[in-house]
């Protein structure tokens, strides 16, 4: 806690099971007092290698549409981590290497990347609250909804900052691995069961549909988006994305999106984007 500025989950191997395990691992880690944690998008090892730990399931890497689907879902999840990073071996991780045959997965990742940039004022403000108030970047639902018995059992949804509930997709929908390669699924299910904690209402980030808390819903989860919900009474500061994080933060073109069924307020943290003045 004193010296670990940024931690990550280690050199993981690509599989859906690994992705599922990463989410509670990160939440438990951050619950112990480390605000900055991340994972290698798409796992560090993609192929099967000579050693026991080199145990990825995708020898064809970016040529395998099944891996492109897994990588896309991993990418969408990591968009809502304190540190957003593609890193690993076996294949290059620049986004344009993941275009595939029809570009569907590539476009889904571009959309997630754009959203990360749009949310930088929110992310930066959350980081400011970590510094100022010992807040957390990500946290399990039990922290905010301790009296909701169902929320206490949820391990694959979490809060990113104080307003966003992230619900990663951790099951394949489009391609199934087999002994002969990737099999495209006919009429795939494109929904994910999501629990909306009681005590407040929730807005679907993509559609602005309002839901009462304390219920399970089937959330739309096509490949182009991750189920994402905004807590009632939230204000989200957003910006138009630019060519870099620095340019985006410094552009000054702020938009405040208000999700109001009741009075609400928001504390925006900003600075000049350079130097150590924030320490004072």
Q: What positions do the PLM features span?
A:
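Catalytic-domain carbohydrate-binding cleft regions of carbohydrate-active enzymes
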Residues: 1-225, 230-231, 265, 270-278
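Edge strands and adjacent loops of beta-rich recognition modules
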Residues: 237-280
């Amino acid at each position: 806690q004193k010296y670990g500025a940024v931690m990550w989950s280690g050199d993981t191997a690509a599989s859906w099971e690994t992705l599922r395990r990463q989410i509670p691992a990160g939440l438990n880690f951050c619950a112990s007092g480390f605000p900055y944690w991340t994972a290698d998008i798409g796992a560090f090892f993609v192929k099967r290698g000579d050693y026991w730990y080199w145990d990825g399931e995708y020898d064809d890497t970016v040529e395998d549409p099944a891996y492109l689907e897994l990588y896309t879902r991993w990418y969408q999840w990591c968009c809502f981590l304190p540190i957003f990073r593609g890193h690993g071996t076996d294949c290059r991780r620049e986004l344009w290497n993941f275009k595939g045959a029809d570009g569907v997965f590539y476009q889904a990742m571009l959309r997630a990347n754009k959203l990360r940039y749009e949310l930088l004022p929110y992310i930066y403000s959350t980081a400011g609250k970590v510094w100022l108030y010992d807040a957390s970047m990500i946290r399990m639902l039990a922290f905010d909804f301790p009296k909701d018995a169902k929320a206490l059992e949820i391990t694959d949804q979490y809060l990113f900052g104080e307003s966003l509930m992230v619900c990663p997709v951790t099951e394949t929908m489009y391609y199934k691995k087999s002994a002969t390669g990737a099999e495209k699924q006919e009429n795939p299910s494109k929904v994910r069961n999501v629990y909306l904690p009681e005590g407040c209402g929730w807005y679907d980030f993509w559609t602005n549909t309002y839901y009462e808390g304390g219920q399970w819903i089937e959330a739309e989860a096509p490949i182009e988006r991750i189920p994402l919900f905004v807590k009632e009474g939230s204000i989200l500061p957003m910006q138009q994305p630019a060519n870099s994080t620095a340019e985006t933060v410094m552009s000054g073109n702020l938009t405040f999106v208000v999700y109001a069924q009741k009075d609400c307020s928001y504390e925006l943290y900003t600075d000049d984007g350079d130097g150590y003045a924030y320490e004072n």
